[in-house]
Amino acid sequence: LLAKAKGIKVITVASSANKVTRAKRLGANLVIDRSKSDVIAQVLKYTKNRGVDAVIDHVGAKTWPVSIEALKVGGRMLACGTTTGADTTINIRAFYSKEAQIIGAYLGSKSQLVSLHKFMKLKKIRPIIDSVFNLKDAKQAHKKMESSNQFGKIILKI
């Protein structure tokens, strides 16, 4: 939603038909169901064999190789999550031959969060919330996250 609001073409990779449908409804330009098609082939077809300018990878170890392969020469990958693990192996030649950059991101500064909030308010963007759990049910919330069945944020109420 944020990228679309900035006028960026968005390619999303999803793991189920339900997530594909929901991502399309949110306005993604291209949604690839990784269980049914080759992500890289679809990205290259859509970008006319160029690759993408940037990837935001919030999944982690399992998706890094594909994320890097999808980049164009000079592309950048923003790494901001480790749901599938923190340790990964990448093809270093594929990385440096693309002159790619990997940028780590965590939460951002207070001023960045304030700017983000203002932008979301201006564009009327609301966060996508999958489910809300009481703190006592944190174990269930974590299991849901590990199952990859959520679409959006999982909230713990304190």
Regions found by a protein language model. Name each.
Residues V55:
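Hydrophobic beta-strand segment of the Class I
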Residues N29-I32, P127-F133:
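Structural signal for short hydrophobic segments within the conserved structured cores
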Residues K19, D38-V43, K62-V66, S115, ...:
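Short acidic active-site motifs
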Residues V43-V52:
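A short acidic, Gly/Pro-enriched loop at the edge of an enzyme's catalytic core
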Residues K6, V59-I128, K157-I158:
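Glycine-rich phosphate-binding loop and adjacent beta-alpha segment
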Residues N49, K124-I128, Q140-I158:
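C-terminal capping/lid region of NAD(P)-dependent oxidoreductase domains
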Residues A14-S15, R34-D38, H58-V59, T83, ...:
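Short beta->alpha linker loops
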Residues L1-S37, Q42:
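Mid-domain Rossmann-like dinucleotide-binding core that forms the NAD(H)/NADP(H) cofactor-binding site
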